[in-house]
Amino acid sequence: MIASTGLLCTVRDTDGRVRVRVVETPIGTQLDRLVKLDDDVQGVLAGGYHGGWLTLAAARRMSLSNADLRPAGATVGAGVLVALPVSHCGLAETAQVARSLAMESAGQCGPCLNGLPAIATALSAVAEPRPAEGELASLRRWAGLVTGRGACHHPDGTVRFIASALRVFAAEIAEHSAGRCAATRHERFLPQFPAASLTECDWR
């Protein structure tokens, strides 16, 4: 039987430059055969922005399959695999994407209209040096309120992405609480998309 294949986009830092590749690969291929996972990688995003972050150690053990990824809070999802270098802040990267995801909604139900902006705001605060007391608790509370309650699964995917960042970058949360950040480079690494305010002429 011929193994099923899929298209995968991989993103990695190579000599200080972001390298993006698109490859066709069998489902079930080990992740470390698809993107180089050496010690300058601090975390791996599997499945895109509705997927989840993995620790480097976990990613080295896993394959491109939902059977492997889902128990760890990630998915094959959009077929995106990003190796985040240690030079960048995983919290800041995730917060930037969360702000965009909060705007990528139809605004038709409370979890998208109110919940995702509140989550993005709280995560942005946690990603700053010395966040105000209670911001992390507020973030977790909002995430719990939103999960499973949207008219679609956009809130669920967004919360999965953010919750995985809180697990994988827990040490960075502690650094930020003490007024420090381990990042040495501050330009954005994750691919971004523009987010504009919803207006009366929006497609809705």
Segments predicted by a language model, with ranges:
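Redox cofactor-anchoring modules in respiratory/redox and cofactor-processing assemblies
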Residues: 1-204
